Each structure stands twice: as structure tokens, then as C-alpha cells.
């Protein structure tokens, strides 16, 4: 009996250490009924996050789906890749007004007032920052929407006609590692 229990515990310990190293990854889709951003997938390019960008020009280990793949670790949001770490930041200061961007490299820092943690998936399966939904602003590069965090500014960064969106999480089963342009 004792030997069986010991063997069972040993096999559980091996199974726990053999857990897959791939984080739980997901894509994001903008939800805003009655607006052109509705169902636009999220993209990463030029150090920023967009919705509906026609080409993100990422360097991938397979075919670029055209959409960014994300994961959350310890409240921080990352782009899924195999090379250097690409971490999302938010600048809610008066200067940043909710700017969302990303840095490349383990020691890269964002703007002076940037925040790295506060990301989560809420009970409705939406990505939120500090419990708040995101904002999409039209007329960015290639007619895409730029994505911003809520910082109490309806039209951040001098944009016009911005709308609040829900960023619906879509789990990815077989993520493709990419490096997104800075």
C-alpha cells in the first residue's frame, strides 16, 4: 500500500514538471455593435496595437495569420513569440492618455509613466486593463483603429470619433510564434 502511494505521488510529481511550456495564448476581436470596428481582429505593428490593420508585417515561424497572438503572465500582457520578449505597456498619464504599446527585449522600458501589469480576462471573456474596457480610434495607419486603454479621455492622443469596445478573447490552439515590428 505504501509503495503504491509513493509511486502514485512520484508519477504526479513527474507529470507536474512535464507541463507544457507554451502559455495559454489568445487572439482578440473588437466588439462594438453598429461600428466599423465590430469583429476586427487585433494586430501588432510598429510598437502599437491596432484593430483591422490589413498587414502587420510580423516575422513568424509559420504563416502570419495577420492577427496578433497574446498571453497573460502575472498580470502582464505579452505578444507570443520565440525570440525576444515583447511586452505590452499602458501609459495613462496626462501625456500618454491611455497609450498602449509594446517593447522588445527583456530589459526594454516603455515611456516613463508606463504600467506593465493590470491585465486580466473578465467574466465575460473580455480583455481588460485595471478592470476597464479598451478604446478604439479610427483613421490610424492603413485605415486601422488604434487601440487605447481607458484613462478618462474620450478621444485620446488627439483622435476623433473614438469608441469604447469589448476586446473578446479567442483562445488559440496552435499559436504561431512571431516577432512584431517595433
From Swiss-Prot:
Question: What subcellular locations does the record give?
Answer: Secreted; Secreted, Cell wall
- Sites where a glycan is attached: 57, 107
One GO cellular component term of this record is: extracellular region
Q: Which UniProt keywords apply?
A: Cell wall, Glycoprotein, Secreted, Signal, Sporulation
Q: Does the keyword Secreted apply?
A: yes
Which GO BP terms, alphabetically?
A: conidiophore development; phialide development; sexual sporulation resulting in formation of a cellular spore; sporocarp development involved in asexual reproduction
**Leader peptide range in chain numbering:** 1-18
Record bears the keyword Glycosyltransferase? no
Main localization of the protein?
secreted
What top-level branch of life does the organism fall under?
Eukaryota
What conditions trigger expression of this protein? Expression is highly induced by the V-ATPase inhibitor bafilomycin B1 and by oncanamycin A. The promoter contains two abaA ATTS DNA binding motifs.
Phenotype reported upon loss of the gene:
Leads to reduced sporulation and division of phialides instead of forming a single flask-shaped cell.
User: As annotated in Swiss-Prot or TrEMBL, what is the tissue specificity of this protein?
Assistant: Mainly present in phialides and conidia.
Q: What does this protein do?
A: Cell wall protein involved in development of asexual structures such as phialide and conidium development, and thus required for spore formation. Plays a role as a general stress protectant produced by the fungus in competition with antagonistic bacteria.
Similarity-based family: Belongs to the phiA family.
UniProt protein name: Cell wall protein phiA
Lineage of this protein's species? Eukaryota, Fungi, Dikarya, Ascomycota, Pezizomycotina
Amino acid at each position: 500500500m505504501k509503495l503504491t502511494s509513493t509511486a502514485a505521488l512520484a508519477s504526479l510529481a513527474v507529470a507536474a514538471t512535464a507541463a507544457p511550456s507554451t502559455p495559454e495564448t489568445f487572439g482578440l476581436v473588437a466588439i462594438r455593435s453598429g461600428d466599423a470596428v465590430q469583429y476586427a481582429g487585433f494586430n501588432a505593428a510598429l510598437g502599437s496595437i491596432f484593430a483591422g490593420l490589413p498587414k502587420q508585417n510580423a516575422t513568424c515561424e509559420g504563416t502570419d495569420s495577420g492577427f496578433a497572438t497574446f498571453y497573460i503572465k502575472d498580470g502582464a500582457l505579452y505578444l507570443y513569440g520565440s525570440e525576444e520578449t515583447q511586452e505590452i505597456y499602458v501609459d495613462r498619464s496626462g501625456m500618454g492618455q491611455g497609450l498602449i504599446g509594446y517593447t522588445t527585449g527583456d530589459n526594454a522600458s516603455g515611456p516613463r509613466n508606463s504600467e506593465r501589469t493590470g491585465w486580466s480576462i473578465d467574466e465575460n471573456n473580455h480583455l481588460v486593463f485595471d478592470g476597464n474596457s479598451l478604446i478604439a480610434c479610427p483613421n490610424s495607419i492603413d485605415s486601422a483603429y488604434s487601440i487605447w486603454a481607458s484613462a478618462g479621455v474620450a478621444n485620446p492622443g488627439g483622435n476623433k470619433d473614438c469608441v469604447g469596445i469589448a476586446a473578446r478573447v479567442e483562445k488559440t490552439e496552435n499559436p504561431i510564434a512571431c516577432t512584431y515590428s517595433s
